[in-house]
């Protein structure tokens, strides 16, 4: 064998090895949590969603950059091996702690990994473009031990079918009850061997939104209020990449941005996504017992097939071993797997005073079908909905007014208040006019625009 042939085979073998090591990432995001009230020490968690292959097994660590001018810090994959979460997807978690030297308006923590999947249609030569995610967050004394939003719905239901709307929702929750908003972003890249700001956070080469690739028009949007990412509807088979941002707001000030970068695979198979129905958004007084039924049904495929379906639910109203969970009592959701249509799930929650807050609880429900493997490789499709639930303080009970003519005054008395929480206030309004009862709307607190002061 000639030296030229040996060199050729070696080159092919080398490139093949590189490709096997460089193609496995589907999506991911970085979560930040302050873990000390005395120092600026934070815990950083990178969650990635990957193919179930050797490249994923070999990704035992990643490089973090913390945005303060320091060098790379290496974080090990925690909790042992990757976790199989279905649909050919593995979940990987990398954790590291870091202490910042001083407060700042914003720090940008980022991770770049040289393993983006090959053949992504809206990124040129995607296999050569590092996977990249970042989270920016503010450090100041007024924020306390703040955490950035946690994304409960994994990037696993990422298969779309030509001609059908695709939906994904991250089911983001916030530990402190801050307001969340959503917007589209662009997929980015970065040098995984340096923390230089000049070489990180760059727009991926020739990136276009997924709906801008095919000649047939379609829309690709995200609902700024509930996080529904909808592609209506994919037109061409292939891999596509996208990214969106979850903004965290407190008292009208933005305090963090979390990026989820993820892949959508469009296929042409004989399957129709199921449909899910949730109750109307609701507002209740603390102490109300909630019991609601969630319904879902599969949709006939082209060949007239109905598949078994499973309903899932995520939210911080359920028991979780993290700071993101609400205080007890927790909500419960029960639903049998792989039901025939219509499928049923039951949500129950005994609300209490400690659940009162300004922002809604966004409870995520998802239905997934389970087609046979011999139909398009068993491609599972989903539908999802967000149910918004707000809990307000209960009304005062037993209110009585005793008129004192001698002093032209009234003595107000009421029963012991049910939700006498720390820093809670009962505000008394008065009005010098004829007495006409005012009936507040179900979720209105106070006496807005009624003439009372």
Identify the residue ranges that each predicted region occupies.
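Extracellular interdomain linker/stem segments of modular secreted and single-pass surface proteins
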Residues: 265-273, 385, 390-398
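Extracellular acidic, Ser/Thr/Pro-rich low-complexity tracts
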Residues: 48-52, 171-178, 294-307, 353, ...
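Structural beta-strand segments of beta-rich domains
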Residues: 40-44, 166-168, 288-292, 408-412
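Recognizes extended acidic, P/S/T-rich segments that occur
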Residues: 85, 337-340, 425-453
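Short, solvent-exposed loop/turn segments at the edges of extracellular beta-sandwich modules
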Residues: 116-120, 247-255, 367-380
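Strand-loop-strand motifs at the edges of beta-sheets in extracellular beta-sandwich domains
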Residues: 209-234, 325-352
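Pro/Thr/Ser/Gly-rich low-complexity, intrinsically disordered linker/stalk tracts
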Residues: 388-423
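Residue-level recognition of secondary-structure-to-loop junctions
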Residues: 92-115, 223, 233-236, 351-357, ...
């Amino acid at each position: 064998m000639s030296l030229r042939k040996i060199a050729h085979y070696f080159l092919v073998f080398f490139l093949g090895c590189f490709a096997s090591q460089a193609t496995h990432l589907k999506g991911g995001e970085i979560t930040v949590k302050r873990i000390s009230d005395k120092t600026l020490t934070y815990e950083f968690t990178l969650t990635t969603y990957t193919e179930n292959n050797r490249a994923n097994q070999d990704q035992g660590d990643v490089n973090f950059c913390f945005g303060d001018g320091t060098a790379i810090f290496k974080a090990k994959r925690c909790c042992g091996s990757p976790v199989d979460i279905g649909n050919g997807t593995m979940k990987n978690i990398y954790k590291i702690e870091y202490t910042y030297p001083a407060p700042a308006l914003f720090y940008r923590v980022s991770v770049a990994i040289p393993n983006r999947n090959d053949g992504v249609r809206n990124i040129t030569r995607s296999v050569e473009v590092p996977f990249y995610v970042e989270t920016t967050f503010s450090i100041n004394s007024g924020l306390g031990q703040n955490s950035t939003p946690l994304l409960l719905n994994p990037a696993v239901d990422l298969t779309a079918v030509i001609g059908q709307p695709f939906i994904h929702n991250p089911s983001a929750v916030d530990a402190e009850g801050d307001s969340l908003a959503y917007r589209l972003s662009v997929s980015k890249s970065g040098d995984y061997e340096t923390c230089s700001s000049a070489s990180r956070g760059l727009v991926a080469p020739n990136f276009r939104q997924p709906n801008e690739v095919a000649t047939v028009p379609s829309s690709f949007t995200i609902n700024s209020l509930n996080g529904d990412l909808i592609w209506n509807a994919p037109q061409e088979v292939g891999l596509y990449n996208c990214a969106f941002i979850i903004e965290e707001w407190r008292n009208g000030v933005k305090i963090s941005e979390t990026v989820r970068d993820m892949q959508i695979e469009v296929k042409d198979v004989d399957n129709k996504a199921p449909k899910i129905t949730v109750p109307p958004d609701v507002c209740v007084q603390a102490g109300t017992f909630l019991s609601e039924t969630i319904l879902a049904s599969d949709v006939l495929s082209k060949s007239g097939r109905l598949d078994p379906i499973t309903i899932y639910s995520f939210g911080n109203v359920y028991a979780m071993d993290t700071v993101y969970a609400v205080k007890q009592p927790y909500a419960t959701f029960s639903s049998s797997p792989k039901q025939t249509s219509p499928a049923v799930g039951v949500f129950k929650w005994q609300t209490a005073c400690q659940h009162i807050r300004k922002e809604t609880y966004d409870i995520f429900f998802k239905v997934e079908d389970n087609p046979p493997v011999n139909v398009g490789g068993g491609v599972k499709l989903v539908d999802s909905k967000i149910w918004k639930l707000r809990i307000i303080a209960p009304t005062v009970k037993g209110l009585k007014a005793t008129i004192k003519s001698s002093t032209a005054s009234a003595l107000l008395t009421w029963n012991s208040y049910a939700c006498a929480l720390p820093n809670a206030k009962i505000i008394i309004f008065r009005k010098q006019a004829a007495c006409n009862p005012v009936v507040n709307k179900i979720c209105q607190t106070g006496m807005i625009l009624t003439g009372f002061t």
